[in-house]
Curated annotation (Swiss-Prot):
Tissue expr: Overexpressed in several carcinomas.
Family matches, as PROSITE patterns: EGF_2, EPH_LBD, FN3, PROTEIN_KINASE_ATP, PROTEIN_KINASE_DOM, PROTEIN_KINASE_TYR, RECEPTOR_TYR_KIN_V_1, RECEPTOR_TYR_KIN_V_2
Protein name: Ephrin type-A receptor 1
Residues annotated as domain SAM: 913-976
Residues found modified as Phosphoserine: 906, 910
Species classification: Eukaryota, Metazoa, Chordata, Craniata, Vertebrata
E.C. number(s) listed in UniProt: 2.7.10.1
Glycan attachment residues as annotated in the record: 414
Length: 976
């Protein structure tokens, strides 16, 4: 009894100790001896003197346990205790065992040092089995789990004081495969009490995380099990790369490593607990899942229902394009206030105050519209928009300051100015722009004190006079002129509508004083200064002898001049016939060759504007309507506009303007181009409609070319035009240049940028700012300075600044290259110095990709270093016409000669290869489209490409024969 009593007493004491708190995992119990309702009936081996079952009463409930305290002094203690068969089922592959036990301290036995063979540990073992094996112990089949040692052992003193501690041991059994198992406890000599044994497995419980629900999950035998969550109602998976919500169930039944999460849909936000998505209340919105919470509707917007994703603007308020739902709604501004003006001559200043209501925006802008009316505002006469001569400073649109300066107005005319206030939401509603207007009647523009009357013709009883009006009259201006004519005997007044008058019924050989003034609905203007004119003396009835001699001499002189003209025209016709026979000209310009006026420099005129009118047609600005800016020229902006000549239909034109800030000497340079164009008439030369020189801004009006400059047109339509279309365009350019050369003009700036294309793909030569007249067909023009377009200019023109028709032929070859390369820049990124050196060394541009061989041969002929060997434009035109008539000849692709490839001096490869990288090489031969093909094939160095064959290129996906030929020819050039 000595070994039993102390242990039993200890059990009664320790059962009163609290158990440790449960784990977070969900535990499913398979066996728990502490809940047993009767004796456990476990297998004891040996049946006696070993483990024994004990019963204790706790709070009226029996508690069954096992204890073993062997006789001390024996070293061969071998006591076994086996549990009943524990059914595991098919679910859990990993179970846990929890032991509650006490162990007596060996030193607490009588003797102090502990009895012989006393131990303080015992062993836990298990055996798997698909069924109950009965009372057969089968010790060899058990596998050891662990050696169980007590953290706290007790002594007799602990029993007496009631401080015995209960030990708890947990261990796991993994990767179980049978339907059940047995537990066994092997005691090698410890005094131990097995208070309870619990066998269980763990599950990850159902849970919520990140607005996603995760189900109850069984862990795996080892490692983590990934489980996908399900988003709660009105929630969606995050669009971020983390993706849908996921968590990982650990073998211990705990949720670990959350990845991703759900977010509430637009119109919903997380509830206070973060476990549900609730609708945004009315008056608030949530536009996207990136917004953390519902937001209050911005000003002037509302959301009447719950769950709104956007707040709608209230009536009369809007959001400007590009403004998001988070921006407050705003309205258009009210009209400008207190519009006033001050006038000085034909200039006007308008001022106004900002609108009283800006609509809640800061981007208020103003627009000013000008109308010229035949009557006053009270008369209600018809009005039309002001012409191009009216200018607004700083502008008429998008004004940020409430003021504008207007000039270019006409005297004695009625104007109405309308000022509109606009902001970012103007025009979004049904209401129009808020505006205010003012009507103004202009007075006298200026004094006529500087007006000069000029005598046109005089006779004994008539005087024809003309004068320059102070400003051109516009339609509806109702201007008339009143002349005051007097001499010593009479005085008369006469009114005319034009600045020209024929005074009749005058006295012969009499002096008359004449002055003029303008009459308008506002009243008469001031008179001009007095001018004296004298009529011719009366003609006598008979001729004197001297007069008869003069008449005879005049007749003889006229006959001689007529005879000289006839001889000159006969010889000229003979020369023209001989020239046509030599050149076999076919162009339309040969059919009607005109004798053109020789080029006259405007500086030779005392009045250069009058010189320009000798070669051009002066247009009335009232016939023009400016639409939009289409470009910026050397002298000013270029506009698209409309020209309506009297009794003719409207036509679209291009309007080049001379800006007011140009230096004083620039305007005659501007008009010089018009004087040259005015002498040309050819379907492939840009047609001049006329000029405006009598009012600022000075303008040149030409026909409008819908497709703009040739180089930009080709870049936009790369691979859309077939070779036949390109040849037709080149034939047109050659025809125009042939016309110029036959009239002894050298262009000096022939390039694709100076060729214009209309809607029918007809090309016309333009930009004659550098054009000069040669003395004869083979003449030269030498310039003293100025910039030269190196990439398009012949070498002799670069070196000696001497320009001929042959230098234009060289430029035409560059234009051909531009056309066949669809607008590429000649010579790429080479500097001008590198271009000049390469040309002097004999290098020429390589053929463009898929360039027909006959066209490249023409290019090379144009680039002959000796200018005498270059073909004339007539032969170029004829050759291009032959190619158009025989399109099959365009199928042959030009060979790529690597000896003509332009090499940059800065490139220095190895082994005779002038390129550092494969991409540089492919770009130089215009095969850069295949850079990825070479990279994918692993050909990243120039040494790798030297052994390529046609079969290799086919396998790489380069199948076009012309492209294969170009690449292989270049490689062969490296080898040579």
């Amino acid at each position: 009894m000595e070994r039993r009593w102390p242990l039993g007493l200890g059990l009664v004491l320790l059962l009163c100790a609290p158990l440790p708190p449960g784990a977070r995992a969900k535990e499913v119990t398979l066996m728990d001896t502490s809940k047993a309702q009767g004796e456990l009936g476990w297998l004891l081996d040996p049946p006696k003197d070993g483990w024994s079952e004990q019963q204790q009463i706790l709070n009226g409930t029996p508690l069954y346990m096992y204890q073993d305290c062997p006789m001390q002094g024996r070293r061969d203690t071998d006591h076994w205790l086996r549990s009943n068969w524990i059914y595991r089922g098919e679910e859990a592959s990993r179970v846990h065992v929890e032991l509650q036990f006490t162990v007596r301290d060996c030193k607490s036995f009588p003797g102090g040092a502990g009895p012989l063979g006393c131990k303080e540990t015992f062993n836990l073992l298990y055996m798997e089995s698909d069924q109950d094996v009965g009372i057969q112990l089968r010790r060899p089949l058990f596998q050891k789990v662990t050696t169980v040692a007590a953290d706290q052992s007790f002594t007799i003193r602990d029993l007496v004081s009631g401080s015995v501690k209960l030990n708890v041991e947990r261990c796991s059994l993994g990767r179980l495969t049978r339907r059940g198992l047995y537990l066994a406890f092997h005691n090698p000599g410890a005094c131990v009490a097995l208070v309870s044994v619990r066998v269980f497995y763990q599950r990850c419980p159902e849970t919520l995380n990140g607005l996603a629900q995760f189900p109850d999950t069984l862990p795996g035998p080892a490692g983590l099990v990934e489980v996908a969550g399900t988003c709660l109602p009105h929630a969606r998976a995050s669009p971020r790369p983390s993706g849908a919500p996921r968590m990982h169930c650990s073998p211990d039944g705990e949720w670990l490593v959350p990845v991703g999460r759900c977010h509430c849909e637009p119109g919903y936000e997380e509830g206070g607990s973060g476990e549900a998505c609730v609708a945004c209340p009315s008056g608030s919105y949530r536009m996207d899942m990136d917004t953390p919470h519902c937001l209050t509707c911005p000003q002037q917007s509302t959301a009447e229902s719950e769950g709104a994703t956007i707040c709608t603007c209230e009536s009369g308020h809007y959001r400007a394009p590009g403004e998001g739902p988070q921006v407050a709604c705003t309205g258009p501004p009210s009209a400008p206030r207190n519009l006033s003006f001050s006038a000085s001559g034909t200039q006007l200043s308008l001022r106004w105050e900002p609108p009283a209501d800006t609509g809640g925006r800061q981007d208020v802008r103003y627009s000013v519209r000008c109308s010229q009316c035949q009557g006053t505002a009270q008369d209600g006469g018809p009005c039309q928009p002001c012409g191009v001569g009216v200018h607004f400073s700083p502008g008429a649109r998008g004004l940020t300051t409430p003021a504008v300066h207007v000039n270019g107005l006409e005297p004695y005319a009625n104007y109405t100015f309308n000022v509109e206030a606009q902001n970012g939401v103007s025009g979004l509603g049904s209401s129009g722009h808020a505006s205010t207007s003012v009507s103004i009647s202009m007075g006298h523009a200026e004094s006529l004190s500087g007006l000069s009357l000029r005598l046109v013709k005089k006779e004994p009883r008539q005087l024809e006079l003309t004068w320059a009006g102070s400003r051109p009259r516009s339609p509806g201006a109702n201007l008339t002129y009143e002349l005051h004519v007097l001499n010593q005997d009479e005085e008369r007044y006469q009114m005319v509508l034009e600045p020209r008058v024929l005074l009749t019924e005058l006295q012969p050989d009499t002096t008359y004083i004449v002055r003029v003034r303008m009459l308008t609905p506002l009243g008469p203007g001031p008179f001009s200064p007095d001018h004296e004119f004298r009529t011719s003396p009366p003609v006598s009835r008979g001729l004197t002898g001297g007069e008869i001699v003069a008449v005879i001499f005049g007749l003889l002189l006229g006959a001689a001049l007529l005879l000289g003209i006839l001889v000159f025209r006969s010889r000229r016709a003979q020369r023209q016939r001989q020239q046509r026979q030599r050149d076999r000209a076919t162009d339309v310009d040969r059919e009607d060759k005109l004798w053109l006026k020789p080029y006259v420099d405007l500086q030779a005129y005392e009045d250069p504007a009058q010189g320009a009118l000798d070669f051009t047609r002066e247009l009335d600005p009232a016939w023009l309507m400016v639409d939009t800016v289409i470009g910026e020229g050397e002298f000013g902006e270029v506009y698209r506009g409309t020209l309506r000549l009297p009794s003719q239909d409207c036509k679209t034109v291009a309007i080049k303007t001379l800006k007011d800030t140009s230096p004083g000497g620039q305007w005659w340079n501007f008009l010089r181009e018009a004087t040259i164009m005015g002498q040309f008439s050819h379907p492939h030369i840009l047609h001049l409609e006329g000029v405006v020189t009598k009012r600022k801004p000075i303008m040149i009006i030409t026909e409008f070319m819908e497709n703009g400059a040739l180089d930009a047109f080709l870049r936009e339509r790369e691979d859309q035009l077939v070779p036949g279309q390109l040849v037709a365009m080149l034939q047109g350019i050659a025809s125009g240049m042939n016309y110029l050369s036959n009239h002894n003009y050298v262009h000096r700036d022939l390039a694709a940028r100076n060729i214009l294309v209309n809607q029918n793909l007809c090309c016309k030569v333009s930009d004659f700012g550098l054009t000069r007249l040669l003395d004869d067909f083979d003449g030269t023009y030498e310039t003293q300075g100025g910039k030269i377009p190196i990439r398009w200019t012949a070498p002799e023109a670069i070196a000696h600044r001497i320009f001929t028709t042959a230098s234009d032929v060289w430029s035409f070859g560059i234009v051909m290259w531009e056309v066949l390369s669809f607008g590429d820049k000649p010579y790429g990124e080479m500097s001008n110095q590198e271009v000049m050196k390469s040309i002097e060394d004999g290098y020429r541009l390589p053929p463009p990709v898929d360039c027909p061989a006959p066209l490249y041969e023409l290019m090379k002929n144009c680039w002959a270093y000796d200018r005498a060997r270059r073909p004339h434009f007539q032969k170029l035109q004829a050759h291009l016409e032959q190619l158009l008539a025989n399109p099959h000849s365009l199928r042959t692709i030009a060979n790529f000669d690597p000896r003509m490839t332009l090499r940059l001096p800065s490139l220095s490869g190895s082994d005779g290869i002038p390129y550092r990288t494969v991409s540089e090489w492919l770009e130089s031969i215009r095969m850069k489209r295949y850079i990825l093909h070479f990279h994918s094939a692993g050909l990243d160095t120039m040494e790798c490409v030297l052994e390529l064959t046609a079969e290799d290129l086919t396998q790489m996906g380069i199948t076009l024969p012309g492209h294969q030929k170009r690449i292989l020819c270049s490689i062969q050039g490296f080898k040579d």
